[in-house]
Design a protein with these regions (language model features):
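Membrane-proximal amphipathic alpha-helices
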Residues: 61-73, 88-89
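Intrinsically disordered, low-complexity regions enriched in Pro/Ser/Thr/Gly and acidic residues
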Residues: 144-176, 181
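Acidic, glycine-anchored loop motifs typical of Ca2+
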Residues: 162, 190-192
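N-terminal single-pass transmembrane signal-anchor helix
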Residues: 29-60, 64, 75-76
Length: 212
């Protein structure tokens, strides 16, 4: 019995000594990173960042371009649906003095002449709500009853392009019998319009789709 108790006490002492033994092994013989090692690690990280950053930025730019391309296609399709549903052209619904339909975002950009705050009408008033022509609820709305009527909202939210600028439509040409080109367009990454409102093809880094 006495021998068994000694054995138990011995085990307890050994269990108490284990952490100290571990600390002893980690103490004077253990080493952290030296200054040289830290400098080498930071240098490697810097090199990796320098290598990867252009690739990451390229993918980001491509993703933004893809989004803008899909946006102009979607807006064009929604405008065509609006015309088909109502039998009316947005160009005939513009408030006096307005010649462009613009989404949210910056307008009045440099380059070719497109819409400004003075002649841009909110595109959302045609696609999100049925209130074209002005900000009053009694404006020249699209028909709301009958076979040919406004069947929106065609989209719940119209945002700016990926670079913070508004999508634009030269809507004054979007009237019956007018054969002039009509664009849904973004000024692209540089925020400058290189495509004129009368051009039949895109220029520069502009992104757009012809409605007609």
């Amino acid at each position: 019995m006495l021998q068994q108790q000694k054995s138990i006490r011995g085990e307890k002492m050994n269990s108490k000594q284990k952490p100290d033994a571990v600390l002893d092994r980690m103490g004077p013989n253990s080493k952290g990173f030296t200054l040289v090692e830290i400098i080498v690690i930071l240098a490697v990280i810097s090199i990796l960042v320098a290598i990867l950053t252009p690739t990451v930025l390229k993918y980001i730019d491509e993703a933004r371009g893809d989004r803008a391309g899909e946006d102009v296609k979607s807006i064009s399709a929604m405008i065509n649906d609006l015309i088909k549903d109502t039998g009316k052209y947005p160009g005939n619904k513009l408030e006096s003095g307005n010649t462009f339909l613009c989404s949210t975002g910056n307008v009045g950009l440099s380059g070719q002449t497109w819409g400004t705050t003075a002649n841009c009408e909110d595109l959302a008033n045609h696609l999100v709500v049925n209130n074209p022509g002005d900000t009053a609820s009694t404006g020249d709305n699209y028909p709301s009853t009958g076979k040919f009527r406004w069947k929106g909202p065609y989209i719940t939210n119209l945002s700016e392009d990926p670079w913070g600028n508004g999508y634009q439509i030269n809507a004054s040409t979007l009237v019956g019998g007018n054969t002039s080109v009509t664009w849904v367009i973004s000024a692209g990454p540089d925020g400058t319009f290189q495509t004129s409102v009368t051009s039949t093809s895109l220029s520069g880094d502009d992104l757009g789709v012809r409605i007609k």
